[in-house]
């Protein structure tokens, strides 16, 4: 089990102080870069994709819609009943088995954060209607594995609970999903991705468990709690087992050096991966845009 430390500067991350239109940090994300680090861009720190088309995240009429439901499960790791937000695609049927994407939030969020920031259900409904994605189940759990898992007070005090979540995910969340839904359970049918702190978790947990996840994505990841060489100690195994490794960050994000370090190591070791540096900051636009493109490539 990982027992990382979480430096406050590096976790920063999706704690969003927003008062616009009377909304709190729990209601709307900031649209500015985060972190105090100096931004130094390299020649290959460029966008791999254009901005998504207009309306990609809009609720479209005349198409089939998936279902979004809040699900409770018993966590032995935490000793409590916990919640996760689950999307099932249009036409979901017990007669068919589906791949699963585990989508992780930032340090200031919970199981509702992705829905508030990016509406993955709308992205998936639209992509499926256009034939651009594989029907999948998306699981948005709470990465704060403690009995009081609400994002309140000093969220940094909960940092150890983000490490405990590795066990909750592997031993409680995934088994609960497999018992409740009709899902494929092989490694090539399981993906993990996240934003900010959740991006750091996705890289830490996903790359440490290549027997469980073949698709891994980190969007403007908070610090990986291991140096790149420890995060991925066996590049040859990663090349063999990973179907997709995705790294992204905005060129206005003061934390870009974290992702740059991982990208540089992967490039040095010739590990194939997506490296997408767009024109955004540490914000919801970056996360939504990268999820949009990630969804089109996962499980292909």
Where are these regions (language model features)?
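Positively charged n-region of N-terminal signal peptides that target proteins for export
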Residues: 1-5
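Bacterial N-terminal signal peptides
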Residues: 8-19
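Non-catalytic cap/lid and distal C-terminal segments of serine-dependent acyl enzymes
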Residues: 26-300
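Sec/Tat signal peptide C-region and signal peptidase I cleavage site
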Residues: 20-25
């Amino acid at each position: 089990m990982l027992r990382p430390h979480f430096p406050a500067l590096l976790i920063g991350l999706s704690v969003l102080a927003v008062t616009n239109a009377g909304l709190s940090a729990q209601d709307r994300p900031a649209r500015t870069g985060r972190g105090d680090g100096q931004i130094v861009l390299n020649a290959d720190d460029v966008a791999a994709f254009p901005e998504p088309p207009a309306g990609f995240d809009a609720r479209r009429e005349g198409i089939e819609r998936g279902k979004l439901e809040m699900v409770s499960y018993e966590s032995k790791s935490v000793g409590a009943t916990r919640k996760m937000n689950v999307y099932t695609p249009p036409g979901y049927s017990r007669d068919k088995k589906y791949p699963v994407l585990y989508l992780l939030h930032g340090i200031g969020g919970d199981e509702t954060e992705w829905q508030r920031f990016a509406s993955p259900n709308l992205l998936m409904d639209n992509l499926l209607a256009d034939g651009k994605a594989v029907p999948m189940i998306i699981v948005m759990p709470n990465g704060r594995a403690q009995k009081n898992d609400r994002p309140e007070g000093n969220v940094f005090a909960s940092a150890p609970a983000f490490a405990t979540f590795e066990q909750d995910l592997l031993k409680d969340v995934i088994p609960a999903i497999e018992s409740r839904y009709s899902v494929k359970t092989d490694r090539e049918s399981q993906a993990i991705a996240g934003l900010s702190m959740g991006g750091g978790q996705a890289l830490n947990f996903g790359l440490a468990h290549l027997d469980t996840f073949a698709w891994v994505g980190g969007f403007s990841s908070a610090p990986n709690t291991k140096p790149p060489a420890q995060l991925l100690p066996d590049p040859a195994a990663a090349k063999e087992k990973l179907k997709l490794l995705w790294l992204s960050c905005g060129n206005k994000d003061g934390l870009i050096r974290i992702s740059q370090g991982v990208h540089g190591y992967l490039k040095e070791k010739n590990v194939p991966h997506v490296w997408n540096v767009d024109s955004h900051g540490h914000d919801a636009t970056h996360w939504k845009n990268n999820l949009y493109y990630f969804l089109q490539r996962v499980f292909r």
